[in-house]
Structure formats: C-alpha cells, structure tokens
Amino acid sequence: MATYTHFAKQPDVLKHLILCEVLKNETPQIYVETNSACAIYPMTQTPEQQYGIYHFLEKADEVPSLKDSIYYQLESGEMAKGNYLGSPALAMNVLGKQAKRFVFFDLEKSALENVGTYAKQIELSASVEIHHADSSRGTIELLPSLPTSSFIHIDPYEIDKKGDSGVTYLDVLIQATLLGMKCLLWYGFITGDDKASLDNYITSSLEKAGIKDYTGVELTMNSIRKDSVLCNPGILGSGILATNVSQASKDIILDYSNQLVDIYKDAKYKDYDGSLYIQHL
C-alpha cells in the first residue's frame, strides 16, 4: 500500500465530485493525470474522513441532485465495502472503454502499482499507461503529441513551486490550455495568507498568458486564520480551476460548489467550525 494518507477528506469531495461530472460532460478520448496517487484505498474512519466523505454521503442522501451524482453513486457502493475510490478509479469508471488512453504519473511506485492492479480488475489495462516520473516534466513533454480533445487533470497540491523541469503545475495548465486542451486543476492552502498569494499568482499568470475564459472556485473553512493554523483537517481550503470546458461543465462546477457549502453549513471538524465559504476567481 502506498504511503498516501490524503484521501476521502473534504477537499477530495470537492475535487472528485466535480471531476466525475466534468468527465461525463466532456467525454475525452485521452485522460492524463499528473499526480495520480492510488486508485483505491481502505477506509480508516479518521476524523478527517468523517468530516469528508462520511459527512458528504450522509448529507447528500437528502439532496436529490447530489445523490444522483456519479461521485455519490460510485463512492457509496465502494464505501459499503470499506473502500474509497481515488481519482484514477473514478476517471476509469466514468470514461470506461470509450476513452482510448489513460496516462497516470506519480512519484510513488506503489501507488502506480495500485492503479495498474485496479485497471486489470475493471478490464482497462490495455488503455492504461503508468509513468513513475516527475509529472511536471513528463506532462510538458507529452502535451505536443496530444490531440486538443485530451483532458488534463492536474492535482499536485502545490501549483506555484517549480519542479526539476523548471515549470510549475500552473505552467502545465497554461501550456495545455493554449494548445486547446481541457484542463481541471486542483490546489490547496492552509492559511489566509497562502490563499491570497495563490489567488494573485493564478489570476496574474492567466492574465499574462492571455487566458480569459476560465472557471475558478474555492471552498474554504471558516476556521481558517490569516497566518496560523487553528485546526488541521489536512488542509483548510482548496480550489478548482477549469479551462476549455463546456458551459455545462462550468455550470456544474459552480452549482456543486454551492451545494457543498449548503451541506457543510452545520458541519464540525472535531470541535471546530467545519462550515465553508465560497469564492470565485
């Protein structure tokens, strides 16, 4: 089992709920994921997971649009078996055999082995490629060979730090966007200062690149503080940035984000305020 412990938490709910619906809308032939981690995880019922997937499943049960979501359908079935599906498994289940190619990057070999095993189980091995490599370099090198119909899922946590390739993950999104590809980027932050810095970095970088058509939304715990950490459920806020996607996908990103704020309005993380607020980029 891989060493990854960040799964089934509240930011994963945002990321994975939206990923599933956007993939269903966009139906790409090629799916690339920069930081795959595992396809499937055994649940451990930590406080962070209680605040994440368990809270979502309980509350979504009462909200028809969330209960009808692909994410709810896939995770509720797997959670009954004691497992959580990560983004590689969700993407493979949503796209299935209609996708010609899945490309997964990660630095954890055991995580990629997990992805490969899961692909075999659902009979998609023939279309799955795994790359044990730095994905900022690997993805940048891959982009010129991909058709514009490709979908790039960028999920590194830190989007403003340059890797060995000399580029950041926001640079990867910008390059792919300028080539006409559909992109979904997720990022996280733990303080208000982090959030403000990232917001400025994202908007100024997109403006410099001439990218005006994008959808950005952030969900942040009301427990966040300017430059300190009051509580730590993994991270205190996260954002989704989408480019070159359809209007239907843009609408879903905003709609589901607002619905998550609604179902978290009385939430608690341990004894802390677990409610969220939304901000658009």
Identify what each model region corresponds to.
Residues 1-281:
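Class I S-adenosyl-L-methionine-dependent methyltransferase catalytic core
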